[in-house]
């Protein structure tokens, strides 16, 4: 199997990704039998709920030290000590110390909303013609709202993929007035690159939530959280119709991998050059929450 690589933004070096449960992932997404099992798991909500319930049991705490060591997770960033976590899910949804994720300054700067691997498409209209295994990405299916499709069809889109080892709380990328969240029911297919290489429209089929953010510098911004295999719960901690500063927490994903998608209207943001360069090469850029994503083009 071809190794997954990304650019580490902190070093600008190409890195081979450590795949959690690699043998299991290879079985699920590279074999005929495994793909059948994966589809069954993704289309059976009870199994995801059962998995989530298990990860909330106190005895799952014993997995935490080994997981931290294998994935080289920095424990100094944790708000809690390891001994304070009540379950593996409690660890998975951990909070960090505020100083662990400094927020890029400037009211014209949009920041990365999560820790994760980023791909940027500055022109959705061009991306709409992108074909993966003969399957077109559909903005209409993703949003399920004709007015929103028309509004963002010529804008930009950012995909941020969270791995199992990532910090799984998501944050506001800009100063905004946050609207209500709309839930779109769907399946729970994996968003791992092994799955996406066969069908990018997984994002349009999975359970997801959608929130529109009103901003002064970036117009209206559309923010989506996409569930994935074993992630049935997308938890919102913000209050609708309230103003938030960039970097404020919006919510968190419970156990599993997941993705955040952010859409901008046309002509409002100039993305950082390194992110654009890597995306053009088809390489994700691994970023931390709060780093610069781009600058407003509005006066």
Swiss-Prot record:
It is found in: Cell membrane. Binds 1 pyruvoyl group covalently per subunit. The record marks 257-258 as: Cleavage (non-hydrolytic). Pathway: Phospholipid metabolism; phosphatidylethanolamine biosynthesis; phosphatidylethanolamine from CDP-diacylglycerol: step 2/2. Is synthesized initially as an inactive proenzyme. Formation of the active enzyme involves a self-maturation process in which the active site pyruvoyl group is generated from an internal serine residue via an autocatalytic post-translational modification. Two non-identical subunits are generated from the proenzyme in this reaction, and the pyruvate is formed at the N-terminus of the alpha chain, which is derived from the carboxyl end of the proenzyme. Pfam families: PS_Dcarbxylase. It is a peripheral membrane protein. Keywords: Cell membrane, Decarboxylase, Lipid biosynthesis, Lipid metabolism, Lyase, Membrane, Phospholipid biosynthesis, Phospholipid metabolism, Pyruvate, Zymogen. GO terms for biological process: phosphatidylethanolamine biosynthetic process. Its EC number is 4.1.1.65. It catalyses: a 1,2-diacyl-sn-glycero-3-phospho-L-serine + H(+) = a 1,2-diacyl-sn-glycero-3-phosphoethanolamine + CO2. GO terms for molecular function: phosphatidylserine decarboxylase activity. It comes from the Bacteria. The modification Pyruvic acid (Ser) is found at residue 258. The active site is at residues 115, 171, 258. HAMAP family: PS_decarb_PSD_B_type2. Heterodimer of a large membrane-associated beta subunit and a small pyruvoyl-containing alpha subunit. Catalyzes the formation of phosphatidylethanolamine (PtdEtn) from phosphatidylserine (PtdSer). Belongs to the phosphatidylserine decarboxylase family. PSD-B subfamily. Prokaryotic type II sub-subfamily. This is Phosphatidylserine decarboxylase proenzyme.
